[in-house]
């Protein structure tokens, strides 16, 4: 396999992961609404649906190879916002070792995915 094929496979794999995350946001919003920062206005599940839609739209962009640069940059920004407003506060204010570990895992996961999205954006012609 050449490098371009491997790169395309990696991007499609990320797209599938993001699509699953997005679908999960729509199927199980009640499991995620508790993570919405308290400084945001109370709009119920809307705060869960918006990133879910963003994940699905990023997946579509990656799979169709349209607007990849924009989608990847926006995905990275969204994930860094999650790290700073959700996962880091959860880590710093964790009520148990288990919660602290889960928050740290989420910090690392979202940072890694954001870094990959930045790599995709920086190498995408469109």
Q: Would you name each region that the model predicts?
A:
Residues 9-10, 29-42:
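Short juxtamembrane and helix-loop transition motifs at transmembrane-helix boundaries
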Residues 1-27, 47-53, 57, 63-126:
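Extended, low-polarity transmembrane helix blocks
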